[in-house]
């Protein structure tokens, strides 16, 4: 649509019918090592997600339940600690100032998992989203731009089947 395409959405079961009703922490980065084009593409996508979902919410007026909150991972032993520290150096090089992979002393709280080594990783790139809210937020944004959302219809023009 941003490039001028005419769009219609045909979903026989209705938008978000198959979406999970819970929050998902599935927006996490690949480990910052053995870098390749797929990992670079994923990094760029994760970095664009905040502005993308903010724009969707602004257009449609519904929250997608997106937030880039980071992720805490306990480190089990000395070998894991050495690997995490090497990855922190790699992340600094690959991610630049856009995100961080911190190795820090673990601070036990009511909601964290104990770390056997006393250290943990905190990355600032991981995010969470609410799948059903995200679908409904996209629908609201599309409808605000005049896109028909249908349960039945005929294919017209270029067809993209999405799952």
Write out the residue ranges for each language-model feature.
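N-terminal Rossmann-like FAD-binding beta1-loop-alpha1 element of flavoenzymes
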Residues: 1-8
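Conserved acidic E/D residue at the C-terminus of a beta-strand in Rossmann-like folds
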Residues: 9-13
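Conserved FAD-binding subdomain of flavin-dependent enzymes
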Residues: 14-71, 81-91
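Flavin (FAD/FMN) cofactor-binding and adjacent substrate-gating region
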Residues: 57-59, 63-145
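A conserved short coil-to-beta-strand element within the FAD-binding core of flavoproteins
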Residues: 148-159
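Short, well-ordered coil/turn residues at beta-beta hairpins
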Residues: 162-163
């Amino acid at each position: 649509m941003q490039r001028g395409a005419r769009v219609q959405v045909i979903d026989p079961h209705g938008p978000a019918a198959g979406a999970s009703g819970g929050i998902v922490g599935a927006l996490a980065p690949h480990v910052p090592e053995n870098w390749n084009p797929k990992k670079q593409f994923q990094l760029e996508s994760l970095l664009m997600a905040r502005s993308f979902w903010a724009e969707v919410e602004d257009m449609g007026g519904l929250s997608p339940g997106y937030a880039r909150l980071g992720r805490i991972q306990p480190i089990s032993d000395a070998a894991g600690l050495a690997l995490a520290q090497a990855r922190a150096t790699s992340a600094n090089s690959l991610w630049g100032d856009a995100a961080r992979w911190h190795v820090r002393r673990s601070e036990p709280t009511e909601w964290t998992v104990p770390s056997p080594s006393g250290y943990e990783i905190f990355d600032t790139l991981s995010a969470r989203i609410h799948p059903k809210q995200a679908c409904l937020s996209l629908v609201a944004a599309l409808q605000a731009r005049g896109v028909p959302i249908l349960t039945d219809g005929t294919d017209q023009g270029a067809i993209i089947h999405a799952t």
